[in-house]
Every structure is written in structure tokens, then in C-alpha cells.
Design a protein with these regions (language model features):
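Asp-box/BNR beta-propeller blade signature and adjacent active/binding-site loops
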Residues: 1-406
Length: 406
């Protein structure tokens, strides 16, 4: 049953500021929010060039007052990760950036394109250093971490080599799921990821090429042992509707899932930098999905979160920042989006910056529940003034509160 409600959006709160004049793409961007083991909030963000090599420079800040003020994290301010069957915590998948290789030259690719390079079936590659997926387990007391090898059951699992000869390791493909597609549900963990992959539902190798091989495809996995084993469940390949709207679209990618009040699972999907976002629904725990339909006219890394009061929130953007909500238990009917204004640049040379056009944010957001009725939204604002009044790239937060109408 739908409920009448409205959202109260709090004022912007600055978490951290970048350096004056640092306009490099990837610096002071891509915030994510977490709870810590000691009851605080931790927000992390990237400070490195946004490349497939992934140099991995992550900064963070913590709040002990619900997001009102922020400071440097201490050693004990560790992220609260899900427990594994061995008593350790699952801290995600190991990040290993793309790197040059030559050993793939001895293999015949299953697919080659100028746009996306070469695709191979991972099981046919004898060398395992780039096809192996590694998880990270953390000691719940000390926080010390170590790697473990994941057993991945994925029909026609892909591995790709770019046109410049860089292999994109399988463990990095799975690493993407912890930022945009990890869902805990009881004793099970579902993770969704995306890649220029194959048709994992194909009856044979010869039938494993998808209609749009140069577009991303979303794949969903289930783990009953908190990440040690990943079993393929389903896929959401790019469809004709996406191609018709924009032949240059990236395809379905950056998936984010949430369990809805009626027990179903909704998934939000990006299709491009300034292209529509889509939504699909599963009523059988990710084994099948409804045909994706347009969610909004934009949406990179769309976030979705169901609060304990039954209201589901979404945040997304590019070229504008939006928040949306629904009381529909199935998550299929949403209220109109709310546009959140960002700081306008006062720099007359804004259009000459590295990204080539005026842009106010990376528009990658994070959503974290604070209570039954409140969530924390994190985002970047490229022109927010620092303590000296100088506009710099900044990591920001705003509280979203659900108020039920009488």
C-alpha cells in the first residue's frame, strides 16, 4: 500500500576539500559512505586519475555525530563489513588495474572489435594470474586483511584485452560490484557487475556472442558463503531500446540493487554518461528480470536504498543531481525526481578545464541509511568554496529525511 510522504533535504555539509587548482578528472571524486565497527560514519573518495590502470589513492573522513561534522579517521574507525562463515569479514574483491600483457598472443580471441579490443573465454586461458578472482577477508578485531581465491562459477566467463594490449583482470571486474552492486540478504550475498561479456545463458560456445558485443552487459551472482564462491544467476544484456535511443550508448552498466518491501529486488542501470537510466525487477531472487524500462533521462552510478519505514530512495545524476523516492512496495512507481542544485562556477575559463565543458560534479553519489527515516547522501561539488572562499572540488553530504503526511 502506497503512503503519502515528502522528503526534507538538509543543507549541504562539506566533508573534505580538494587542492586549489586541481581539476584532474578522478581527483576528489566518487564518494561512498559506510558504517564503521564503532558506530561512526565513514566516507571515502578517490584521489587518482580515472584510468583502467587504477592507481588506487583513496582518502576518507569520519563523523561521530550523524554526518554533521567530519574529521580524520583513526585506526579503530574501520568499515563494518559482512561476516563470513569462518568468522572473518568480507572486505570486497581485490583491485588489480589493467596492465600490459603478451601471453594472450598465443590464443585466438572469441571476438574482436576496434572499439573494445579482444574478448576471450577465461577458461581457455592457461595462465591464471589475470583470470583468478581474489576476495579480501578482514579480521573483525584487528582489521588486518589477507587475500583468498574465489571460486567463480560463470558460464562463458569473459576476459578482455584492449586494443593497446592491456588486460583487464577478472578480479577487477568483480571489484566493480562492491561499489555499485552488492546486496546482502539474510545469509546470502548478491553481487552485480558489468563487462563487455558473452551470453552466459547460451547453449553452446558457438551461440555465446551477444547481439551487441561492444555494449556492456550486466551479470548477477549469488554467494552463500559470503564471497568465497560466486554462482552465476542471470544477465541483463543491452537491448534494442537502448540502441535506438542512442547508438553510441555504453549499454547496461553500473548496476545497483535493493531489496524492496514486497520482497522483490529492483536494479537500477546506467546506459551512458548523459543517457537514460533504466530499472528492472526480480521476484525470484535475481534469477529472472522484467524487461528494463526507462527510470529517468539520466543517471550514472544510480544508487537505490530502501529504508526500514518502507520508503525507497534513489540518487543519480549527470548533468544534474537528482533524488527520487517511492512508497510503492514493488518499487515500480516513483514520485517525480527532486533536483538538488550545485554550486555555480565563478571561473570565466570554466569551459577550458580538462573535461572540456562546464561540469559541476562527477555525479557519482552514495546513499547510507542513518535511521528508519533518514539517509545520508554523498556527492561531489566541483565549485564549493573552501575555508578561504576559493572554489575547489569538494566532497559533500546532505541528509534526506522522510516525513509522512497526515
Amino acid at each position: 500500500m502506497k503512503k503519502n510522504f515528502h522528503l526534507v533535504i538538509g543543507n549541504p555539509i562539506a566533508i573534505a576539500h580538494g587542492e586549489v587548482g586541481d581539476d584532474a578528472w578522478g581527483h576528489t571524486q566518487f564518494p561512498a559512505a559506510f558504517h564503521t565497527v564503532n558506530g561512526k560514519i565513514l566516507v571515502s573518495w578517490e584521489w587518482c586519475d580515472d584510468t583502467i590502470e587504477y592507481k588506487g589513492n583513496v582518502h576518507s573522513a569520519v563523523s561521530c555525530d550523524g554526518g554533521n561534522s567530519w574529521g580524520e579517521p583513526a585506526a579503530e574507525d574501520r568499515i563494518s563489513y559482512p561476516k563470513m562463515s569462518n568468522g572473518k569479514c568480507f572486505a570486497g574483491f581485490f583491485k588489480k588495474g589493467a596492465h600490459p600483457v603478451s601471453y594472450f598472443d598465443q590464443y585466438i580471441p572469441a571476438y574482436t572489435s576496434e572499439a573494445c579490443g579482444k574478448r576471450y573465454f577465461a577458461k581457455e586461458i592457461r595462465e591464471k594470474q589475470d583470470t583468478t578472482v581474489y576476495g579480501i577477508e578482514a579480521d573483525p578485531v584487528t582489521g588486518e586483511t589477507e587475500l583468498f581465491e574465489c571460486k567463480i562459477n560463470w558460464p562463458y566467463m569473459p576476459i578482455g584485452v584492449t586494443a593497446s594490449g592491456m588486460v583487464y583482470p577478472s578480479t577487477m571486474v568483480f571489484c566493480l560490484s562492491q561499489r555499485c552492486g552488492l546486496l546482502m540478504s539474510g545469509e546470502k550475498m548478491y553481487f552485480s557487475l558489468y563487462f563487455h561479456g558473452f551470453n552466459s545463458d547460451a547453449a553452446s560456445r558457438k551461440e555465446a556472442l551477444l547481439p551487441y558485443m561492444d555494449k556492456y552487459c550486466v551479470y548477477i551472482f549469488e554467494s552463500c558463503d559470503c564471497g568465497r564462491t560466486g554462482n552465476y544467476l542471470s544477465q541483463i544484456p543491452t537491448n534494442e531500446e537502448v540502441i535506438q535511443s542512442n547508438p553510441n550508448a555504453e549499454g547496461f552498466c553500473e548496476p545497483m540493487m535493493a531489496r524492496l518491501p514486497d520482497g522483490s529486488i529492483s536494479i537500477l542501470l546506467r546506459t551512458g554518461s548523459n543517457d537514460p537510466s533504466f530499472i528492472a525487477r526480480s521476484t525470484d531472487d535475481c534469477r529472472t528480470w522484467t524487461k528494463p524500462k526507462v527510470f529517468d533521462s539520466n543517471g550514472v552510478l544510480p544508487q537505490i536504498l530502501t529504508l526500514k519505514n518502507g520508503i525507497t530512495l534513489a540518487s543519480y545524476g549527470r548533468p544534474i543531481l537528482k533524488v527520487r523516492a517511492t512508497s510503492d512496495p514493488s518499487g515500480m512507481e516513483w514520485d517525480a525526481p527532486i533536483i538538488l542544485p550545485l554550486t555555480e562556477s565563478t571561473d570565466p575559463k570554466e569551459n577550458e578545464k580538462p573535461w572540456g565543458k562546464k561540469q559541476q560534479s562527477c555525479f557519482y553519489t552514495g546513499l547510507l541509511p542513518l535511521s528508519d527515516h533518514t539517509a545520508l547522501l554523498t556527492y561531489s561539488d566541483f565549485h564549493y568554496p573552501n575555508s578561504d572562499g576559493i572554489q575547489v572540488k569538494s566532497i559533500m553530504a546532505r541528509k534526506i529525511t522522510v516525513v509522512f503526511d497526515e
